[in-house]
Amino acid sequence: MLPLFALLLTLSAEQQAPVSATFISKEDHEAVLKKQIADNVVDQPIKASDVLGGKASVAMLHRVKPEASALIHDYVTETYYIMSGTGTFVTGGRLGDAKETDLSKYNAGISHTGTRIGGESRRVKPGDIIIVPAGTPHSFSALDGPISYLVYRFEPAQKK
């Protein structure tokens, strides 16, 4: 009986082994930023990984002017890490004239853009972290020059 228990314990441990991690080096994300500045690209996905049936991803964003409209991601929560630059970031409020857009190629899923109405403004600077829950309107209303930031996106598994 003891050998059978040991075998079952071993099989159980093997089935629950952790999934291999996704690694992004400093050199990797700095190379992405350098290329996107040269190519004038705003949102550049770096890597994505399946997690619990959903998707976790990292993207580099580089903006030279504030956004013309605000954005809501229906299912994706984003966490921003400001790397360089300063500006004013607005969260909350609501969208006027909202239009659906599919941002799946950026790992941001079904989203809506529209005119920002209300919300809370905050000054952001290098080192700041902002968590934007799914369904929250957000945008940069002003920039003091170019701004670069990493975005961590998580889209949970969708119920079928």
Q: For each predicted feature, which ranges?
A:
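Bacterial N-terminal signal peptides
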Residues: 1-12
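A short, N-terminal "cap"/entry segment at the start of jelly-roll beta-barrel domains
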Residues: 11-75, 159-160
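A mature extracytoplasmic/lumenal domain signature
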Residues: 62, 76, 83-86, 91-95, ...
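His/acidic/aromatic-lined binding-pocket segments of jelly-roll/cupin-type domains
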Residues: 71, 78-81, 122, 129-130
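Short, conserved beta-strand element in jelly-roll/cupin
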Residues: 74-89, 93, 102-114
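Acidic, glycine-rich flexible loop segments
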Residues: 109-130
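Conserved metal-binding segment of the jelly-roll/cupin
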Residues: 123-143
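A short hydrophobic beta-strand segment most commonly corresponding to one strand
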Residues: 145-160
